Amino acid sequence: VLLVAAIGIFIGASTSSGMMDIARHGILQPSHYSFADVMCVFLAVSATDVILLDIFNTLGMPTSTTVSMVFGLLGGSTALALKHILNEGLTYSQLINTDKALTVIFGIFLSVAIAFVVGLVVMWITRIVFTFNYKKHLRWTIAIYGGLSIALIFFFLMTTGFKNAPIVQNSTFGHFVQDHPVQLFVYTTIIAAIIVEILHLLRVNIFRLIILFGTFSLAMAFAGNDLVNFIGVPLAGLESFLDFTNHANGVSAEQYNMGVLAQPSTLPGVHLFLIGAGVIMTVAIWTSKKAQQVVQSTINLSSQNESEEVFSSSKVARTTVRNVLNFNSKVARYIPVSVQDWINGRFNKDNADQEEGVAFDLVRASVNLVLAGLLITIGTSFQLPLSTTYVAFMVAMGSSLADRAWGRETAVYRITGVITVVGGWFITAGAAFILAFLIATLNNVGGVFAMLGVILLIAFTMISNNRRFKKKQEQAENVDVLFRQMVNSRDKKEVWQLLLRHTQDTQVHLIAASREIFKGVTHGLTADNVRSVRTADSKLKDEREMWKRYRRKEILGMR
């Protein structure tokens, strides 16, 4: 899967026709900004994006490059716009594309709710059709499902992934795609359904095929849109520099107008930059432990299995679970018992066709990929700005809720996790605006020395985060093997013995920790050593959180 994703990213970056215009003139009005102004803004946005994304990656939290870039541009442009408003009497709307900015912001966050609801509804219907024992229900359904899925993915590739590729733009087939999208989808569905049925008769795993196609299409669309959009900021800065050096003719950087950014990009060798960015991201997929941790966070929140929860409980999550359970009980009164029993039977997991150790089965994986691709296609066709990160994450959360992956014991923890992640997105937006505003102001006031300081700040932040991440990884290597064996075991006697051993180890650890904490407190009080007492207090808080995690694990083991 990683290999397919890497190929998709590389091809998506290679076939893109150039950077998106939002970095050049989507937020700011370049005709009112000088070369010095735009360089302050572009450096501020680049620094903000790197700092914020590295922080979120270190925390293992998914976030959006699109949101950080858009709000960074808005914050940096606003900082320089205030200078022009005070000095030249211009209005904010003359300096900032307020309508475009509001459209981008509204479209991004609206996609969050739509993706969650669509993922929930479609996954519920799909599970009703296939059940968890899906291999017994493929004879008459796999052709329709596989045909629709592959047709949607192919349509997604043609309209989004390869949309800007010269091969599609300058060919007869490309014109047919643009002029007859409905016919293309119908023909593709019929042909794909026939091919899928033949492959199924040949005992080919259709779900794996759909997953590989979906992974490729999403990766390629991300590289062709989000990646290009993201590196559009430094590329716009490079083009501004080249234009200034070639056409300034003695005009100072503070006086040289950057109206050229309102025109289409003419940066030479832009495809080489895009391919280079694709190669870097491809390497990062294989080697970056931070990226793997971000993916693992999403998998943990959507896992079908009961495992060690990363997030703790919260009052909001408990209230939400309580209200949902009350609502379900009221709705259940109006649904016949026979219908409820039939639906519950379709969601029976006793004989689930799921490989041991995986987070969820192939049915849900295919739904996540196909739906994410479809929603991005629809948004692109209507020219609505979307974040692939937000769409993919919320589809996964909606499908996991529909799949009853959030049980009574795990729902409060996972809802807390979703709230934390979504809240982090709003924090990304606010932090990007404020940080870019401050850095752009600093660049404008401090000049070259301030810009050098910003670059040093980026280096310091990344080094500090990497050290913190390595320490976190060392702590995470202490895997609770007994708990994993309890979760994966189907033998109740074996689970009971493992639970006894786990409880014994927990008590031994807590007694030893209590002894060390008590020694620290008594030493601090007798020797009047405040540092010793503070250290003991910190250890006590850590042990309390660890004890809570142990208790949750043992409650799960008792089930």
Walk through the language-model features, giving the residues of each.
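Multi-pass alpha-helical transmembrane bundle typical of ion/small-solute transporters
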Residues: 1-493
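Cytosolic, long alpha-helical scaffolding segments
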Residues: 468-559
